[in-house]
Amino acid sequence: MDGLAVLSWGLNACGWFFIAYSVLINTSFLVLTLLAVADFWAYLRRVDFAAYDETFSEPLTPGISILMPAYNESAGIVESVQAMTALRYPDFEVVVIDDGSKDDTSEQLIAAFDMVEVPIVVPTDIATKGQVTATYLSRRGANNVLLVRKTNGGKADALNVGINAARKQLVCMVDADSLLDPDALLHVSRPFADDPERVMASGGVVRVANGSRISRGRVTKVRMPNRWLPRIQVVEYLRAFLIGRTGWSRIGGLLIISGAFGVFRKDVLLQLGGLATDCIGEDAELVVRLHRWIGDNDLDGRVVFVAEPVAWTEAPEDRAVLRKQRRRWHRGLTEILSKHRGMVLRPRYGMVGMVSMPWFVAFELMAPFVEVFGVVFLAVALVLMGADALGLTHLELVNQDVIWVLLATSLLYAVVLTLAALVIEELSFRRYRGLRDLAIAVWASLEENIGYRQVNAWWRMGGSLEAWRGTKHDWGDMQRRGLGKT
């Protein structure tokens, strides 16, 4: 076999590897889609009998402490807290933890909610880095807004201070830039009422608020963003939550509850020692550690996902900010999977150990590397094919069928799955009612796969490399425009 034959064999073998990987990852998403469809079908059948008003009026409904860690969030903090105080739930408090902001985050809250400094002793059940410097209570209504100011220690440390300060049975963690639908707590707390012994954590859907109409901290009209970057993130979020989280929850393998909206039993959080401060993705790491704790102690615990409650978040509209976000997210995933690698393929951890963890290693952690090298391969193959077609060369090193099959499996398959998420959204919730918004969403599902997806893979790959090199990383300064200002 001469050198050109060896090169041709190697190139075609690489092509078939990328095809096989693409088929496997997209077929696994197809399975998750079918599981999600089954879950939404069950949801549609039971939604009329949910009796959420009974939950609202039941005096024994567990109280919820809403924790909002804030760092330089003055652009939208007041609107976010206003939305929290307007939620329908019989017993809740809002705890804002200002993690040493450099802007006027605390001053905005103190003025807006007529707060007064009070000498509250925050327990130290969970060890924290930052020191509490002051605590404030609102003089309005039922005094259910508490502001805790502390020295900077990072998001996880701020949440741990919030857990210590929480006075309710359940703890709801939300991002400071998030808005919740009025009935969100009723929905996300329902699993705890239905199965109080086994349910230990519950997560809800997070959607992109950019472009929507915001009034008094509430999304009043859902619209697709006009800018291309946030509208692509809309379809990303729909696919991740309506297919990914719902499908994994259906089989008991939910590995991630978004830090933008998740509820946990406080007693379980204290048992776990709060959130880890030595990794970037503290919210996901907490859920993985919870699964590990359940398995190590032979407990019959559940981590569930509820598709109905909605938290709205502001997606980055600046490419540099989005790059930092995606690098941080993938670095967090890399650190988590490395830290808990002992769970992989261990029956003790059930579906999480046997299915979810291996899947995340193969199709989340490694996906950006395969995609980046796949793009390089495709570019080389197209150049060689073009040279042959123009008569510049007659090498025929790459089988043309390999190129077309790779394009079909990697692009068309992905578009179909994204469109499936849009169909699920329309049949189940119908948040986007206008034809214009639906058309924009469909276009965004196509737009995502041409340029954005490949650049995003490059960013994510960089996040893993940062984790493996041990590069120092902090919370970061994520500039926001503020919800309702798009």
Predicted regions, residues:
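Membrane-embedded multi-pass helical conduit in multi-pass membrane proteins
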Residues: 36, 359-468
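N-terminal membrane-anchoring/stem segments of glycan-assembly enzymes
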Residues: 1-60, 245, 417-420, 456, ...
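A conserved acidic beta->alpha catalytic loop
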Residues: 98-118
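Cell-envelope/extracellular polymer assembly enzymes that use nucleotide-activated donors
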Residues: 62-65, 93, 270, 285
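Long helical/loop segments within the catalytic core of UDP-sugar-dependent glycosyltransferases
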Residues: 118-143, 148-160, 164, 168, ...
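Short aromatic/hydrophobic "clamp" motif used to bind/position activated sugar donors
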Residues: 171
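The conserved acidic donor/metal-binding loop of glycosyltransferases
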Residues: 99, 175-179, 278
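N-terminal signal-anchor transmembrane helix
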Residues: 33-91, 107
